[in-house]
Every structure is written in C-alpha cells, then in structure tokens.
Amino acid sequence: MKAVIFDLDGVITDTAEYHFLAWKHIAEQIDIPFDRDMNERLKGISREESLESILIFGGAETKYTNAEKQELMHRKNRDYQMLISKLTPEDLLPGIGRLLCQLKNENIKIGLASSSRNAPKILRRLAIIDDFHAIVDPTTLAKGKPDPDIFLTAAAMLDVSPADCAAIEDAEAGISAIKSAGMFAVGVGQGQPMLGADLVVRQTSDLTLELLHEEWEQYRIRESIP
C-alpha cells in the first residue's frame, strides 16, 4: 500500500448537514419538497447531478433553462460557502487526524478524490491541506462518481499504480468508483451503500493504519496480488 486516497464529506469531516440546509433552501424556493431521505440520495454525486435529481423528484426537470439551473446552483453554493466558513480543525471526524499522522510517518502518499469544488477551502479550514500530496479538481473530469476517473486521476497525480492504492468512501457511488479503479475499497458506515467494499468500519474512529495494513494483506492474498 503506497497511497491512501480519501473522499471528503463523511470521511474527513461531515458537511452533510450544510449540504442539506443549502439544498433545502433552494428546493423550498422552487416549491419542491426536500427531506433528509432525499439528501441521502445526493451523497457522492456532483452539484449538477444533485440539482437534476431534485428537479426530477419534483417533476420539474424540463421547467428550467440551463442558465436558470446555473443560477440555482450558484445560490446553493453561496449558502453552502457561508456555512462551511465556520469550520475549524475541531470539525475533523474522530480518528482522521491520527490516521493522517500515521500515513505521513510511514511515507504513504495521501490524496483527495472529492466531488466537491469547495474541497481545498474545507481542507484549509480544517488545517490539513498541507498533508495532501494530490487534490483532484473535479471540474476537470468528464464524469463523476461512480465513474472511476476521479480515483484514477488521484493515483496518476500521486504517481502510484491504482493496484497500490487504498481509498476511503462513505457513499455507494464512491465505493463503486474505487472498485472500478482497481483499488482496495474502505467503506465508512453500514448497510446497502457499503456493499462491495473490501473493508467496512462503522465510524472513522475505527480507522487505523494498523487495521489498513492487516486488511490490505488479506486483500492481496484474496485477489492474488503479488
């Protein structure tokens, strides 16, 4: 294992509530009901895909022009930016600071594969941006998760073969993307979204480098990786 690639939301910090509040505000303005179940469906997908999902849910997929959709996304991001500006290093999820230190101490490269265009700002607010050797810009990709491109791009930026990478996700689309990239998939959470992961932990505090090493060795044996 030469590199570990992280998703951001739900793995490094939890801004799901901020996404929920920002999307709910927009949905209410266009008379579409929006609840937490709907918000769960948006985990791991891009802003454009999220808006399309909301519009389809509300039967309004043909109601807005592209320019109007751009304005809705701009307003959502403005609300979200205001909310994330309050983040501090205290908002790191439990165990993540420790894991980053362990990875650095063993010279294992660290990458970020997040669909969020706000990822660099969030990492700066959390005071961990300097820990990352590569941060993928999702705006440069043709497809988002579950397409593997974002993880393959991270591996290329780190100059590490995908087969030598582990990646950590909390969403079904992300797990699918990791496996399609040919990487060791670590899922944070439980239930249906974690199906397909090579290792599942209930919460980030369970993540340690020792556990990753142990499960990585078992994975190599199962997959006959030299």
From Swiss-Prot:
It is found in: Cytoplasm. Beta-D-glucose 6-phosphate binds at D9, G44, I45, R47, S116, R117, N118. InterPro entries: B-phosphoglucomutase_hydrolase, Beta-PGM, HAD-like_sf, HAD-SF_hydro_IA, HAD_sf, PGP-like_dom2. Binds 1 magnesium ion per subunit. The active site is at D7 (nucleophile), D9 (proton donor/acceptor). Its EC number is 5.4.2.6. GO terms for biological process: carbohydrate metabolic process. Its cofactor is Mg(2+). It catalyses: beta-D-glucose 1-phosphate = beta-D-glucose 6-phosphate. Autophosphorylated. SUPFAM superfamilies: HAD-like (SSF56784). Its main location: cytoplasm. The modification 4-aspartylphosphate is found at D7. The keyword Magnesium applies. GO terms for cellular component: cytoplasm. The catalysis proceeds via a phosphoenzyme formed by reaction of an active-site nucleophile with the cofactor glucose 1,6-diphosphate (G1,6-diP). The phosphorylated mutase binds either G1P or G6P and transfers the phosphoryl group to the C(6)OH or C(1)OH, respectively. Belongs to the HAD-like hydrolase superfamily. CbbY/CbbZ/Gph/YieH family. PANTHER family: 2-DEOXYGLUCOSE-6-PHOSPHATE PHOSPHATASE 2, PSEUDOURIDINE-5'-PHOSPHATASE. Homodimer. This is Beta-phosphoglucomutase. It comes from Bacillus subtilis (strain 168).
